[in-house]
A protein has these predicted regions:
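Nucleotide and nucleotide-moiety/phosphate-recognizing core
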Residues: 2-139, 147-160, 168-182
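Short low-complexity, flexible loop/linker segments enriched in glycine and/or proline
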Residues: 67-68, 190-192
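Short, glycine-/aromatic-enriched active-site segment of Class I SAM-dependent methyltransferases
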Residues: 143
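Short, conserved phosphate/pyrophosphate- and ester-handling motifs at nucleotide-, phospho-/glycolipid
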Residues: 146, 188
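Short amphipathic alpha-helices within nucleic acid-binding modules
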Residues: 151-152, 191-193
Length: 193
């Protein structure tokens, strides 16, 4: 199913990064010199009319400063009531702020998958309401979602924390990708070497 709708990006950059030892969003790539949040945003910008970066209250100001001159990038802080709900809370905060984009597809990427390429993201953009899947597992945070603010709000009020619950409610389907290595989620710095 070819996608003809507007795409909006969501970069999930509000995680605690406790196992990583420093905020993953600001970890600098040795090759490009850019932070992981900058790299993730740069992969979405060619495909998206707007990119929203989901931030926690600790990194919000630094992210605003980093992207201050970019009119197509907006930093969205976690909603206080749902700040401990992980990625689901971040996606909700963005969709609440993105009410003008109710007809858009939302391309969701976590900041800690630095090996994802424009090729995989471009393919995902062609398949509305799908998430990435490889032989080794489901990658629920690499997804092309419909606007789902009401569903998210309901899940959060039920104290649901699982992204999978959102995908089930939206009838989101898996999209198979062959290259496992590009979908590596980095939780420890030693996984980079």
């Amino acid at each position: 199913m070819k996608n003809e709708k507007v795409n909006v990006g969501i970069v999930l950059a509000g995680g605690r990064s406790s196992r990583f030892g420093e905020p993953k969003a600001f970890f600098q790539d040795e090759v490009t010199g850019k932070t992981w949040v900058e790299l993730t945003v740069s992969k979405l910008l060619p495909l998206c009319e707007m990119v929203f970066v989901s931030a926690n209250h600790e990194n919000y100001s630094k992210l605003v400063t980093l992207f201050d001159a970019e009119p197509t990038i907006e930093i969205i802080p976690d909603q206080t009531a749902f700040s401990d709900f992980g990625p689901l809370g971040g996606i909700y905060a963005v969709m609440k702020a993105a009410a003008d984009y109710q007809k858009a597809n939302f391309l969701v990427l976590p900041v800690d998958m630095p090996f994802l390429t424009s090729k995989e993201i471009g393919r995902l953009a062609e398949y509305p309401n799908h998430y990435a899947k490889t032989k080794r597992g489901d990658h629920y945070l690499v997804a092309n979602l419909p606007y789902a603010r009401e569903i998210l709000q309901s899940l959060l009020h039920e104290e649901e924390h699982r992204v999978r619950a959102l995908l089930e409610k939206c009838n989101t389907k898996p999209l198979i990708f062959e290259n496992e290595a590009t979908f590596r989620n980095i939780n420890h710095q030693n996984e980079l070497f």
